[in-house]
């Protein structure tokens, strides 16, 4: 099953997926994006496309709930492609060495992310494999 192609069929682009457990329920979440933003109708349309396919070829073992959603303004960055699509946005990063950064993403290549520190405007380059977790954020 090709989630990216199925999302494209619904006029959306696949962002990420995850399997979580909340209140004893297994939830399979699919995050999608679209130029101009994702609305409820977009999520419902993709869910209608996926449900009969998942009935035949389940994405996870056992009983689960399917959720289709936008990753949101403040979203997790877990793939190098996520960083590349987020150039110009603000990000909070924790490295494997427990260093913390709040910065703007200014460049991304195959394995490195270049950041501009929000306070002193210094530029720092981090190898993608050194990042433990990262999330975009919005200053209000």
From Swiss-Prot:
Alphabetical list of Gene3D superfamilies matching this protein:
Ribosome maturation factor RimP, C-terminal domain, RimP-like superfamily, N-terminal
GO biological process annotations for this chain's record?
ribosomal small subunit assembly; translation
Keywords annotated in UniProt: Cytoplasm, Ribosome biogenesis
Where would one find coiled-coil regions in this protein? none
Q: Which domain of life is it from?
A: Bacteria
Q: Which family does it belong to?
A: Belongs to the RimP family.
Q: What does this protein do?
A: Required for maturation of 30S ribosomal subunits.
Q: What is this protein called?
A: Ribosome maturation factor RimP
Q: What organism, scientifically named, is this protein from?
A: Campylobacter jejuni subsp. jejuni serotype O:6 (strain 81116 / NCTC 11828)
């Amino acid at each position: 099953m090709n989630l990216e192609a199925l999302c494209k069929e619904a006029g959306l682009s696949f962002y990420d997926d995850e399997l979580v457990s909340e209140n004893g329920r297994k939830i399979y979440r699919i995050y999608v994006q679209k130029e101009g933003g994702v609305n409820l109708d977009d999520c419902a349309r993709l869910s209608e496309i996926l449900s009969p396919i998942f009935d035949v070829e389940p994405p996870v073992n056992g009983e689960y709930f399917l959720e289709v959603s936008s990753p949101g303004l403040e979203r997790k960055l877990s793939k190098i492609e996520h960083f590349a699509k987020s150039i110009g946005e603000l990000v909070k990063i924790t490295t494997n060495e427990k260093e913390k950064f709040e910065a703007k993403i200014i460049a991304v290549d195959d394995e490195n992310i270049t950041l501009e520190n929000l306070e002193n405007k210094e530029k720092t380059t981090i190898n993608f494999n050194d990042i433990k977790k990262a999330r975009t954020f919005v200053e209000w």
